[in-house]
Amino acid sequence: IVIAGFFIMKNTAKEFMPSLNEGSFLLMPTSMPHSGVEENKRVLQQLDMAVASIPEIETVVGKAGRTESALDPAPLSMYENIIQYKPEYMLNENGQRQRYKVNYNDLFELKDGRFIANPNNSENVTLSAVERSQLIPDNNGEYYRNWRTEIQSPDDIWNEIVRVTKLPGVTSAPKLQPIETRLVMLQTGMRAPMGIKVKGQDLKKIEAFGV
């Protein structure tokens, strides 16, 4: 019984399905409730530009507010920025890691004859805007890393996002993923920007208090 209780306690408050790596983040900060349309538009553009300046980011698309809906209302001061970040290594058309040709100086060779620094072993190298079509596939070569040396995990990318999106009058946001966040919203059934949890011993009294 003790052993069974230990395993039950260990897995309490956990879901059967583990958290998936979606390859993207959902940034949901908010600004001042009284801010106008033009101000919210300006802040949203600043957020998009700040996130896009991170080398590991592929695309970022943001929006302010949502249409008036009883299911999921959101004012203009609530932002949603969907951020797609690059995979750690360059992938081929099948979505698998591909090795690319390097020369004797450990530089990646491009199809046009140019050479670029290898981000795998160069600490201070600036990542170049290199497309997969520019590199030469070679099974004896090396993987081309899309992330800087100091970026070792998606958490590091999120920390960079938090750092660059610290704007006056804008709140911070927890680390979210788009699909995971939508599933949580559907499970909770929240239909307002703010919710109150009511607990008690009698369901009828809880219902009466909530209504």
Task: List where the protein language model places each region.
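Surface-exposed amphipathic alpha-helical segments in non-transmembrane regions
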Residues: 2-11, 26, 39-59, 74-211
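Aromatic-capped interface at the extracytoplasmic side
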Residues: 9-19
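Short extracytoplasmic/periplasmic juxtamembrane "stem" segments immediately C-terminal to an N-terminal membrane anchor
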Residues: 20-36
